[in-house]
Amino acid sequence: MLKLKTAVVAFGAAIVLAAAGYGPAVQAGDWPTEKQCKKVAKDGDTIIKGWCAAITRKAGNCLACHQAMVNPWPEGFPVGGNIGPPLVAMAARFPNRDDLRAQVWDATATNPNTSMPPFGRHKLISEEDIDNIVDWLLSI
């Protein structure tokens, strides 16, 4: 019962923060498209590198299953999927960075029936990409 209350409170906080106008750490216009990521990913900070790993179809491809709250959405960029939960208020949902990293590394550890691939365990993406994705997730 306590876990349910905690989940409800965290979800409520996420809705309130989203409604209050809290946005991602990166400001409007700063989110590169997949094509632009090829240029900025090498020199960008970890948050931009995480965004690029998350949207790149040959890397994390997180947005195939998840929607993300970024403002503004890159022009001409397809909206995210609806298979997984939306990527919103991630710092509230995962106050411990290691827990979020473990979820990205192998979501089957906490939910054997998840459709999320174990990116780290199966070496689908690099450890650096996982760290960068976690940094990006904690910024939104």
Residue map of PLM features:
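Positions in alpha-helical segments
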Residues: 48-49, 85, 114-117
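N-terminal export/targeting leaders of redox proteins
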Residues: 1-36
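Electrostatic cytochrome c docking/interface patches
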Residues: 26-58
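Short pre-active-site segment immediately N-terminal to redox-active cysteine/selenocysteine motifs
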Residues: 57-61, 69, 129
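C-terminal capping alpha-helices of c-type cytochrome domains
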Residues: 98, 102-111, 120-140
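Gly/Gly-Pro-rich "capping" loops immediately C-terminal to redox-active cysteine motifs
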Residues: 63-105, 118-121
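Soluble non-cytosolic domains of exported or imported proteins
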Residues: 44, 56, 94-95, 124-128
